[in-house]
Structures are given as C-alpha cells and as structure tokens.
Amino acid sequence: MERFLHSQPQQIISQCLSANVLLNNIKNIEVYTLAVSSKSGWVYLDTDELSTKGRYGSVSVADKGHLVKSINLIEFKIKECSFIKIDVEGHEWEVIQGAESFLNLHKPVVYFEAKKELTSTRECIKWFMGNGWDCYWHFAFWYRKNNWRKHQDNIFGGTGDMNILAVPRTKIQPDNFPKLQSENELWDGDLYLKFYSDKQIPLV
C-alpha cells in the first residue's frame, strides 16, 4: 500500500486532519505537526486567532508568532518518493533548497504553488529546469462547473491559484498543460484559458 506523508505546522489544523484520517479509517496517511524548510530548527508562523473568520491555510513563516519545529525533506527516511506537493505561502524556495539531495535521489513529480510576483518562484522553476525536470503551468480555479455538489453559482469569478507541475524528463510528459520555456515566463488565468481554447482540448 502506498504511504502519504503530510506535514502541517499549525497544531490545530494538524489535529483536525489527523481526526479526519482516523474517523474515515484511512490507514496509509501519516500526519506530522512540522514545518518544512531549508534546514532543521525552529521557525515562527504568523498564525491567526482561530476564533476569528479567515483563511487559516494562508499562514506563512514570519519573524515572530507561534514557534514550531522545522525539518528538511531528507529527514524523512523513505526508500522512494514519487510525488510531492508544496504549498507553503511563498516559502517554496526554502523547501526546495533544503531538499536538493532528496529530489535528486528520488526524482519525484513536484507540484508547487507559484506566485509570479515573487523572485523565489523563478528560483524554483530555474532549479527544476536546470536539474532534469520540465515545468508546466496549472491554474487551479476556485470554481469549476463540474464541482462535486453541482453548484452553478460562481462566487469566485475567475479567481484561482497558479501552480507549477515539475516532471522529471525521464518520465512521461503531460501534453495537456502549458509548458514553460523559461523561468521568466509570466502566466495568468486568461492566458491559461487561451491555451486550452486554442488547442481545443478540455480544461485541466
């Protein structure tokens, strides 16, 4: 059975995830209350008060706040890794810097959040493209017509999150994602839609 390792630095969110895993009798997910960064140690999170309304998933590393333990990926002693998802609110480059030996050893497919205004996003793309991965854009719209509950009211407009799918060149490459030619390319939701419209293929 495949194992899924999940690292969530916010203790209460980690506890909620662990409770969901337990209540649904899922046996192949392991939840760790840890931050992942460039090195082992401790980091501060700008955690909001959970009694207020907000997006608790948008917490990021800060100069002060709640102190949590941090590790780098190589500390996960596993025999193989096929896929990694990184969503750490602008801290992606630090995670990748700390995971270089891990990534080069396992050559996983990596899916990470991209913020075009951040230099660190370009550093991530540059690293992957220079170390044997091809990179593709993926715009995750917050609303889709084929959503699970079939809601037709789109309250989000065209809002979504831009991400990068990095695939080792030794593996089969997707043909339904826009491929990057350079770390300096700047895509957005409109360009993403145009790619699928021009190619007349289903939106991913």
Descriptions of predicted regions:
Residues 1-204:
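Phosphate/nucleotide-binding beta-alpha loop and adjacent structural elements of enzyme active sites
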